[in-house]
């Protein structure tokens, strides 16, 4: 094993540990702090669960694949597809949060009755199901079985056809997943399109908020709460932006590989390693953003860590002074409030 691959594996293991620790902290915070139990944060928990799975399962799979060991074709294909499931779940969670924030600021009077915790949990279940369908699509036939298996042999040295489970190959991502799936279906249809939709939603959120701030004569308190809503939208938009920053390089490399086959043969090995590490590092970022930008999470993280380090018996309840509420207020109407 060369130095570059060893460095890659060490960095992946560090990312895995940080991802698991940080996102378990997010789930723990929502579980113990009642002010964090709302539809928006349920979507963030879904995102955290996907990031935990990245650290717990996807990164070990990625390390295994990078080694290129000999394994049954469909087992290798499952390893390769699993990270696609988690990526798709993250995309859907971010899209759900964007739509949730748009509804909160666009129809504040109906928001609380329309967006409930029960509906959010049901939607999360549906989105995870869709993520599995999309991510595991290569297992249904859109893969490199025909080109990957005919010349491969099993442990006894006997040749096997593409459709047989005894087909053993060197388990590398590009040996099992077609670039046509990765580029046209996964990237263009299931990653880039939702990112463009989210960009449009957040632009619309800021336009609506600015219009309300400038055209409606709000009372001091109402103006403050609307500004808090805008601050929250900015925090979530940052998360989307960082997701795009971390994942687009890998997808761009896939596009170049697909449209320029000679690049796939000549590209430096380190380029792909950097792109993969960057994509996995995204799973570490979100808890940091929550702690830095969202007061409720910061407060609860502090209490959890204090409890662990100081061995305190009870978890102190949050006071309203330490909570950041996302509230959209309409003139002459009660506020629709949700805390994240």
UniProtKB/Swiss-Prot annotation:
**What membrane topology term does the record carry?**
Multi-pass membrane protein
Example GO biological process = mast cell degranulation
- Covalently lipidated residues, kind S-palmitoyl cysteine: 310
Stored SUPFAM superfamilies:
Family A G protein-coupled receptor-like
Q: Could you tell me which residue ranges are on the Cytoplasmic side of the membrane?
A: 32-41, 100-119, 204-235, 292-340
Disulfide bridge map? 76-171
Keyword Ion transport present in the record's keywords: the answer is: no
Q: Which residues cross the membrane?
A: 7-31, 42-65, 77-99, 120-142, 179-203, 236-259, 268-291
Q: Which UniProt keywords apply?
A: Cell membrane, Disulfide bond, G-protein coupled receptor, Glycoprotein, Lipoprotein, Membrane, Palmitate, Receptor, Transducer, Transmembrane, Transmembrane helix
Glyco sites are at: 151, 154
* Compartments in which it is found: Cell membrane
What's a single GO CC term here? glutamatergic synapse
Residues that, per the record, bind adenosine: 174, 254, 279-280
Could you tell me which PANTHER family the record lists for this protein? ADENOSINE RECEPTOR A2B (PTHR24246:SF18), OLFACTORY RECEPTOR AND ADENOSINE RECEPTOR (PTHR24246)
Query: Which function does this protein serve?
Result: Receptor for adenosine. The activity of this receptor is mediated by G proteins which activate adenylyl cyclase.
Q: Write out the similarity annotation.
A: Belongs to the G-protein coupled receptor 1 family.
Q: What is this protein called?
A: Adenosine receptor A2b
């Amino acid at each position: 094993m060369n130095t570059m691959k060893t460095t890659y594996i060490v960095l992946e293991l560090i990312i895995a540990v940080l991802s698991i620790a940080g996102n378990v902290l997010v789930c723990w915070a929502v579980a113990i702090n009642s002010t964090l139990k709302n539809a928006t944060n349920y979507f963030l928990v879904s995102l955290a669960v996907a990031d935990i799975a990245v650290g717990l399962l996807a990164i070990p799979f990625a390390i295994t694949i990078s080694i290129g060991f000999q394994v049954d074709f469909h087992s290798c294909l499952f390893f390769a597809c699993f990270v696609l499931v988690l990526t798709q779940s993250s995309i859907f969670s971010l899209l759900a949060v964007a739509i949730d924030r748009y509804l909160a600021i666009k129809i504040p009077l109906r928001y609380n009755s329309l967006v409930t915790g029960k509906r959010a949990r049901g939607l999360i279940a549906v989105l995870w199901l869709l993520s599995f369908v999309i991510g595991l699509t290569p297992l249904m036939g859109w893969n490199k079985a025909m080109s990957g298996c005919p010349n491969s042999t099993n442990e006894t040295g006997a040749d096997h056809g593409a459709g047989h489970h005894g087909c053993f190959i060197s388990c590398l991502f590009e040996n099992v997943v077609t670039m046509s799936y990765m580029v046209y279906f996964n990237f263009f249809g299931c990653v880039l399109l939702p990112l463009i939709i989210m960009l449009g939603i957040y632009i619309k959120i800021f336009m609506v908020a600015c219009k309300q701030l400038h055209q409606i004569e709000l009372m001091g308190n109402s103006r403050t709460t609307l500004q808090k809503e805008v601050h929250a939208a900015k925090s979530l938009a940052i998360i989307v932006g960082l997701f795009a920053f971390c994942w687009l390089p890998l997808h761009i490399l896939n596009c170049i590989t697909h449209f320029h086959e000679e690049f796939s043969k000549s590209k430096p090995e380190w380029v792909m390693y950097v792109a993969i590490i960057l994509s996995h590092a995204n799973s570490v970022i979100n808890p940091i953003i929550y702690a830095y930008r969202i007061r409720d999470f910061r407060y609860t993280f502090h209490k959890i860590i204090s409890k662990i380090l100081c061995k305190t018996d009870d978890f102190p309840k949050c006071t309203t002074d330490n909570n950041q509420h996302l509230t959209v207020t309409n003139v002459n109407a009660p506020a629709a409030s949700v805390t994240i």
